[in-house]
Regions:
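Short, low-complexity, intrinsically disordered N-terminal peptides in bacterial proteins
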Residues: 1, 63, 95-97
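Negatively charged, low-complexity tracts enriched in Asp/Glu with abundant Ser/Thr
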Residues: 1-40
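Compositionally biased, low-structure terminal segments
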Residues: 6, 31, 49, 56-58, ...
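Short beta-strand-to-loop capping motifs
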Residues: 7-11, 48-50, 68-71
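Ampiphathic alpha-helical segments that act as solvent-exposed interaction surfaces
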Residues: 20-24, 70-97
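Short, intrinsically disordered low-complexity segments
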Residues: 38-62
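Intrinsically disordered, low-complexity regulatory segments enriched in Ser/Thr/Pro
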Residues: 54-80
């Protein structure tokens, strides 16, 4: 596994990470492949449809969020995934001012 990017809008807040993972499950560009619940983390495995590759969104209750994949992602593919996740996070976590 290698890290792809860090979603700053979700940060390492477990509630925000879990909320983002829940919204990704219903987003049209994402397909939930697997969900694993462990005492130290909740792990959500998704396929990102525009590039047809899987990634893992881990909400680690000790270390924070980890967005990673066992597959090779090009810089352009990673940027597309990051932009899609950030668009969703921006809508969720908009704050005034």
């Amino acid at each position: 596994m290698h890290d792809l990017f860090y979603c700053k809008l979700a940060g390492d807040d477990a509630e925000r990470c879990l909320a983002l993972a829940a919204v990704l499950q219903n987003a049209p560009d994402f397909v939930l492949l697997e969900q694993v619940f462990a005492p130290e983390a909740d792990i959500f495995c998704f396929a990102f449809l525009p590039v047809q590759k899987p990634f893992r969104f881990k909400c680690d209750f000790v270390y924070g969020q980890i967005i990673s994949s066992g597959e090779h992602w090009t810089a352009a593919e990673t940027a597309a995934l990051e932009a899609a996740v950030n668009r969703i996070a921006e809508k969720m976590f908009q704050t005034a001012g």
